[in-house]
Structures are given as structure tokens and as C-alpha cells.
Design a protein with these regions (language model features):
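Alpha-helical interface subdomain recognition
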Residues: 1-117
């Protein structure tokens, strides 16, 4: 799993350098890398037992840092939403629908609110 996460990070970095829209791939790479790291660190914590929570060993710091990385640049749940959004956007573009839903919000503040009764 660690090698797969590392490989996906390299692919995402290349896509960020060369592609116009690497959002889905970058979101997938971040999600997979943080979940894989969390699994590895959680296993290390299980092996260490109660002593793993103390600052005698660096496992507790790795656990805190990993958890922060799962939250800091967007939670993994938000990454799921981004991945789904980009995936469906790619499908819609393949079907010929060219509407960009992100542009819908550009003039939204100028339009009067719709009230449905």
C-alpha cells in the first residue's frame, strides 16, 4: 500500500506539472497517502500499546502529525466530494455537456433569490 501511495503521488505531481486540471488526481493521491499512513501508524501504535502514547517513542508524534495531514488541506471526506465532482464533470464533458457548474456561482449574488412556496 505504501508503494502504491508513493506511486500515485508521483503520478499526481506529474499531472500537476503537465495537466490543465489535476484536481481529481491530486485529491485521490492526498486521500490515499494519508489513509495509508494512518493505517501504518495506527498499526505501530497497536504494537507499542500504552507506551506508544507517551513521548518516549516518536509514534505519538507521528500519529498526531498524520491526523493533522488528514484534516489540514481538506478533510478526506471533502476529498471524496472533490473526486466525485471531478469524475462526474469528466463524464458530462465526454457526453457533450459543457456546462461548468463552478461558473454558476460567479453571478449568484446579483440574481434575486428564488422562493418556492
Amino acid at each position: 500500500k505504501l508503494d502504491a501511495a508513493r506511486g500515485l503521488n508521483y503520478v499526481a505531481a506529474r499531472a500537476a506539472d503537465t495537466s490543465d486540471n489535476p484536481r481529481r488526481l491530486v485529491s485521490e493521491a492526498k486521500k490515499v497517502a494519508t489513509e495509508t499512513a494512518w493505517e501504518a501508524i495506527n498499526n505501530a501504535m497497536q504494537i507499542m500499546g500504552g507506551i506508544g502514547y507517551t513521548n518516549i517513542y516518536p509514534v505519538e508524534k507521528y500519529l498526531r502529525d498524520c491526523r493533522l495531514s488528514m484534516i489540514w488541506t481538506g478533510t478526506n471526506e471533502i476529498m471524496n466530494l472533490l473526486i466525485q465532482h471531478e469524475y462526474y464533470k469528466e463524464l458530462a464533458a465526454a457526453d457533450g455537456e459543457v456546462r461548468d457548474v463552478e461558473l454558476d456561482a460567479v453571478g449568484a449574488d446579483e440574481v434575486e433569490e428564488k422562493v418556492y412556496e
